[in-house]
Regions:
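NTP-dependent small-molecule kinase module
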Residues: 2, 18, 26, 133-168
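P-loop (Walker A) phosphate-binding loop of NTP-binding proteins
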Residues: 11
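Conserved glycine(s) of the Walker
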Residues: 15
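ATP-dependent small-molecule kinase phosphotransfer cores
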Residues: 33-90
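Short glycine-rich anion-binding loops that position phosphate/pyrophosphate groups of nucleotides
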Residues: 79-82, 102-104, 149
Length: 168
């Protein structure tokens, strides 16, 4: 069974997908995004939430996590994936990069309606992040702050760590 070089976690709009794609490109490996897996099979996340509800989405997200953790390369988990106890347990055996971001830095990213749990803006994002902070911390091998750097710089910082930690 394959295992990812790194799993990227963090709150909604922290930049997990963009950073993960850059990491994968730099490492010459694939990138698997669990949100994309769910969307490919079940449709847009806001529509899933509206029609089926969050519990249905979380079930499908868990299946996507299982699939993604069986691949090599870089894996980006959806912001809420760490809420699942089995996912947290599964991550114990993986190199996990936690991307953090300040409310001020994330605010401009919250203007769209693609994120059903933070559609009410910054205050709902803050509450959501506060409710998950301990879960993110519990799975993180290392934290990286995205608040004051570009996606490319953040990806480079994580890349250095992965190469050093994996002996690449």
């Amino acid at each position: 069974m394959s295992t990812p070089l790194v799993v990227v976690v963090g709150p909604p709009a922290a930049g997990k997908t963009r950073v993960s794609k850059r990491l994968a490109k730099a490492l010459g490996v694939s990138c698997v995004d669990t949100d994309a897996l769910v969307v490919n099979q079940w449709g847009p996340i806001p529509e899933i939430f509206a029609a089926q509800g969050e519990p249905f989405f979380r079930e499908k997200e868990r299946l996507a996590v299982i699939e993604a953790l069986g691949t090599s390369g870089v894996v980006a988990l959806g912001g809420g994936a760490v809420m699942d106890a089995q996912t947290r347990e599964d991550l114990e055996d993986h190199r996990v990069a936690l991307i953090t971001i300040s409310p001020e830095a994330v605010a401009p990213r919250l203007d769209n309606q693609k994120r059903p749990l933070v559609k009410d803006g910054l205050e709902s994002w803050k509450a959501l992040v506060a409710s998950r902070a301990d879960l993110y911390d519990s799975v993180a091998s290392r934290k990286f702050d995205a608040s004051h750097q570009t996606v490319d710089n953040l990806a480079e910082e994580i890349l250095r760590w992965v190469r050093e930690d994996a002996g690449l």
